[in-house]
Amino acid sequence: MTTMGTPLTPNATKVMMLGSGELGKEVVIELQRLGVEVIAVDRYANAPAQQVAHRAYTISMLDDDALRAVVEQEKPDFIVPEVEAIATETLVELEQKGYQVVPTAKATQLTMNREGIRRLAAEELGLPTSPYRFVDNFADFQQAVLAVGVPCVVKPIMSSSGHGQSIIKSLDQIQQAWDYSQAGGRAGGGRVIVEGFIKFDYEITLLTVRHINGTSFLAPIGHRQQNGDYRESWQPQAMSEVALQKAQQIAERITTALGGRGIFGVELFVCGDDIIFNEVSPRPHDTGMVTMASQELSQFALHARAILGLPIPHIEQFGPAASKAIVVEGKSNNVMFVGLDKVLEERGTHIRLFGKAEVNGHRRLGVILARDESTDKALAKVERAYANLTVKL
């Protein structure tokens, strides 16, 4: 029988979020609904999840000593990484000391960089993937591009939201792609993956939740990206039953190998009835924000239940839904949103503003959500709502 304490008392059940972005913010809200005391950590102050947590710390999570110190000070029942840029060796050490890392320190370590997870998927599990090479210098990079062939995709082994990613369509773009990859990695310049370009019909995120009752799959999520970063998503993505079964088999194999409990964002390419593994993140996925409109239990609520060992007997879908990211470009520390009344005037439309105070370049500041009779109608609805929004920088 699961027992929960009360926040801010000696018997509190404590969760520490490592990374406090918009996805972490929704997880914090769901945890607090279940009576959990939450501590939010990030590299900058007043990050979205820190705004709704009981306490917050601002440290470099790549600093072993700083990370260890904040964990040992708070002594959380669960440590929940929300980003890749974390000193994972310290998480392994803390797990060995008895701290519970979600889903596991191994999963966090393997998925923090593309090399670990690609070698697990392709070389250990034998899952279908694109052809690839890993390199850490320009000379080897040139050879890798020639070996894989053009077009090909270049990604730093540690990056997110499309940072440092590019497509090489001709050999005269090799230097430009290398320079961009070295500027975009989470831990600075370094190792990259060169991937063969897959001619896929579409790509999906198959959110997979490992919990005390077993493994459950959410309806597949389709999405559109721009420069490697999510812009729109919809659920469900129509696909054949054969392809869906293959996708679920791949998702179950990779998440079982990673272990632990929680939600996993499994990224897959769909080519007819064939499925090709792309990546997996052991945490909520940005494309999964659509589940805040499409499901009774969003990916964040499911993650919270799985972390705490609470049952997930059924995942009910309300119907077709879509999401559209609110992305701006510029520089400001005084962001304002104009026209929210117009955004929300249509039935079944919702908005989430993340509370990010500063913009310096491209930044995702919120998301618009909608339900309708079909995903096409839901997408049209979020587009109409988006057109009514003005962001002043």
Curated annotation (Swiss-Prot):
Location of the ATP-grasp domain: 119-308
Question: Which residues make up the binding site for N(1)-(5-phospho-beta-D-ribosyl)glycinamide?
Answer: E22, L23, E82, D286, K356, R363, R364
UniProtKB keywords: ATP-binding, Ligase, Magnesium, Metal-binding, Nucleotide-binding, Purine biosynthesis
Keyword check for ATP-binding, yes or no: yes
GO BP, one annotated term: 'de novo' IMP biosynthetic process
Q: Which pathway is this protein engaged in?
A: Purine metabolism; IMP biosynthesis via de novo pathway; N(2)-formyl-N(1)-(5-phospho-D-ribosyl)glycinamide from N(1)-(5-phospho-D-ribosyl)glycinamide (formate route): step 1/1
An example of a Gene Ontology cellular component annotation for this protein is: cytosol
Matching entries from Pfam families are given as:
ATP-grasp (PF02222), PurT_C (PF21244), RS_preATP-grasp-like (PF22660)
- Quick one: which residues bind ATP? R114, K155, S160, S161, G162, H163, G164, Q165, E195, G196, F197, I198, E203
**Reactions catalysed, as given in the entry:** N(1)-(5-phospho-beta-D-ribosyl)glycinamide + formate + ATP = N(2)-formyl-N(1)-(5-phospho-beta-D-ribosyl)glycinamide + ADP + phosphate + H(+)
Which InterPro entries does the UniProt record give? ATP-grasp, ATP-grasp_carboxylate-amine, ATP_grasp_subdomain_1, PreATP-grasp_dom_sf, PurT, PurT/PurK_preATP-grasp, PurT_C, Rudment_hybrid_motif
| First-tier enzyme category under EC | ligase
Q: Which residues form a coiled coil?
A: none
The residues that the entry says bind Mg(2+) are E267, E279
A GO term, aspect molecular function: phosphoribosylglycinamide formyltransferase 2 activity
- HAMAP family referenced in this protein's UniProt entry, alphabetically: PurT
Quaternary organization:
Homodimer.
Family, similarity comment: Belongs to the PurK/PurT family.
The name on file for this protein is: Formate-dependent phosphoribosylglycinamide formyltransferase
Gene that produces this protein: purT
